[in-house]
Amino acid sequence: MTRDKRILFIGGSPCSGKSTVAERISKEYGACYFKVDDFLDEFTKIAAGKGKPICKQVVKMTSDEIWMRDPNLQCDEEILIYEEISDLVFEKLEQTDSDFIVTEGAAYTPDIMRNYSYQEYISIVPSAEFQVSHYKKREWVPYILEGCADKQKAFDNWMERDILFAQRIKAKCDEYSIPCIVNDGTRSIDELYKTVKEMFILE
């Protein structure tokens, strides 16, 4: 990838405040905001078409087949999906017509980022309590679970998957000495934003 672009990477786990922080950086500093989640379905289908095994499997699954499985298996699968689409994510970043980009997504796992050797990378993960309480407020949650026979069990499995994912990301960040913020809701969004700006040395 072209290295004359400045790219601020915010990885971590869902429902941690990543997108809110990225949006504020974009507005305050004029950075182009690249949200990986906007391309997840597209990239998963492309990877499936290229024969990537996990993506190929997932695109054919029903809601029950996705959400009613062991959360540990779901977490393993999520990490593998991000690995299978990583080339597509970075290709899209390369095509983005801006020399200053802020990008966020759970797809930026510590292992993937080590492969690409980018320095300006942090992660934000939520505490389990913060994650679940905020997911319950999301308007699109029922849409994701549409088609599940037992929506409560599916939601519980989803939450457990993301709790496990956050734990794995935090452990990898600690192992690799990558800055990682745990958002437990005790700090305001302004305080979280200030911390991230300091990590990226944004004045």
Regions found by a protein language model. Give the residues of each.
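ATP-binding Walker
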Residues: 15-16
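Short beta-strand-centered segment that lines the nucleotide-binding/catalytic pocket of NTP-utilizing
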Residues: 31-47
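A glycine- and Lys/Arg-enriched "phosphate-lid" helix/loop adjacent to the NTP-binding pocket
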Residues: 120-165
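NTP-dependent small-molecule kinase module
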Residues: 164-203
